[in-house]
């Protein structure tokens, strides 16, 4: 309610405007919002706004995006806000229909920097695409499902930040998205510690709204979860999280989120979240690779950690192999322990190996080195027959001494280790591709083994 002598004043609040009633010198504007609303998302603003709207088709059930802007900002705003419709459509396609589509969405300009994601109307200090995307994203992650405590603020801010990155991915392309991730990782790893989840009781506002941890690291952990699960399962899991009747239009804590994701994905994510959500810091990788011998290349992944709270960061590691004649091959290795070995079929000579070319892992100061293992001895051993279904013979020169051997599967898991013998029985092995590592007096020798 305000004095109508200022006839140009317009009020905005949550939900739908129901009426304006002028009585004498007073004008009263009524808004109605029919959803449960967290106290910090209640919004009221009155000033000499100019208004204009955009229409979201919403699959035949249209609703308005109403923009309340200062007269002096009108020309710039009306050029900047139409993209809101495109972003709304993107988020609706990835997750679900806008949660308040039977009311409205809107922007109300205010005099602070940044924005505030009040339910159905975000207060905006400007109209950049990134800010529009971030505040709109909160209508799903923060408003429909709200963090259950300030310790869980990443469920709001981490996901809103990640969704602004998804706008870059979908509107600007892969390279721009990679640049965005690289910039975030640089910020995250600028300090050796810090967890996404806020560990301390009664955290300060500066810790709650820490841009490095709650926003950037929260966003990259969301992205790493996507890479861990695969995009299809990731988006399906988030759709189910938002639709969960125990959480929607209510509150969720991190444990609720994890349980919801695990239920859809049908996978135990305890180790992932212990490392990346509750643990502090980041890994540093050293990747050792060998030139292919008999089309078999070996990769060893070593890791150190920046903070003592995590003894090892489990993650899927992507390597891009570049060939001497312009060939390329991308491999994804599920790294679960330090010093893990992987064997991959590579049909060309490798010139160099790129670690995490798309910036999908929070890490820093990584190295890729060529193994000192000599290929000169790789042909000293042969296996016959291959493929085999019962046993195979190891053929070697007399002057080569083999102490022991280990057989690995394609995931780098050690299936068995044994002392050297001329004939190896594999009748109990499942069919598939394996790799043998021989410990000889001349060095390590690697051979592929195919079991039918």
Where is each model-derived feature located?
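Hydrophobic helix-coil surface modules that form long, contiguous segments used
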Residues: 1-133, 162
């Amino acid at each position: 309610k305000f004095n109508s002598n200022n006839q140009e004043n317009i009020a905005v609040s949550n939900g739908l405007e129901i009426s304006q009633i002028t009585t004498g010198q007073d004008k009263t504007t009524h808004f109605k919002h029919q959803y449960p609303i967290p106290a910090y998302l209640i919004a009221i603003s009155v000033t000499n706004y100019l208004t204009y709207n955009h229409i979201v088709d919403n699959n035949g059930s249209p609703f308005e995006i109403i923009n309340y802007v200062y007269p002096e900002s009108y020309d710039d705003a009306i050029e900047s806000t139409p993209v809101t419709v495109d972003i709304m459509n993107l988020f609706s396609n990835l997750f679900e229909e806008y949660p308040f589509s039977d009311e409205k969405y809107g922007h109300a300009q205010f005099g602070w920097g940044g924005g505030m994601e009040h339910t159905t109307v975000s207060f905006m200090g400007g109209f950049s695409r990134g800010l529009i995307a971030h505040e709109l994203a909160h209508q799903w992650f923060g408003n429909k499902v709200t963090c259950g405590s300030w310790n869980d603020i990443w469920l709001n801010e981490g996901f809103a930040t990640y969704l602004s990155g998804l706008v870059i991915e979908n509107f600007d392309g892969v390279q721009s998205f990679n640049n965005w991730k690289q910039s975030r990782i640089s910020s995250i790893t600028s300090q050796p510690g810090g967890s996404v989840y806020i560990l301390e009781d009664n955290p300060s506002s500066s810790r709650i709204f820490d841009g490095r941890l709650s926003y950037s690291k929260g966003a990259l952990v969301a992205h790493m979860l996507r890479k861990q699960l695969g995009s299809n399962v990731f988006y399906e899991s988030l759709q189910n999280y938002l639709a969960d009747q125990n959480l929607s239009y209510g509150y969720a804590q991190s444990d609720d989120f994890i349980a919801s994701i695990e239920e859809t994905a049908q996978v135990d994510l305890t180790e992932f979240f212990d490392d990346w959500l509750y643990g502090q810091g980041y890994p540093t990788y050293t990747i050792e690779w060998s030139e292919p011998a008999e089309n078999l290349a070996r990769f060893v992944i070593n890791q150190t950690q920046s903070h003592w709270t995590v003894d090892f960061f489990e993650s899927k590691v992507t390597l891009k192999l570049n060939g001497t004649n312009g060939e390329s091959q991308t491999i994804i290795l599920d790294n679960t322990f330090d010093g893990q070995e992987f064997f991959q079929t590579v049909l060309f000579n490798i010139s160099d190996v790129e670690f995490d070319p798309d910036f999908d892992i929070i890490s820093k100061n990584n190295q890729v080195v060529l193994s000192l293992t000599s290929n000169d001895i790789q042909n000293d051993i042969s296996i016959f027959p291959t493929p085999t279904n019962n046993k195979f013979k190891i053929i070697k020169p007399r002057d080569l001494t083999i102490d022991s051997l280990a057989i690995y599967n394609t995931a780098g898991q050690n299936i068995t280790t044994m002392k050297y013998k001329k004939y190896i029985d594999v009748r109990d092995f499942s069919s598939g591709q394996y790799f043998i590592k021989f410990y000889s007096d001349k060095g390590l020798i690697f051979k592929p083994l195919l079991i039918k």
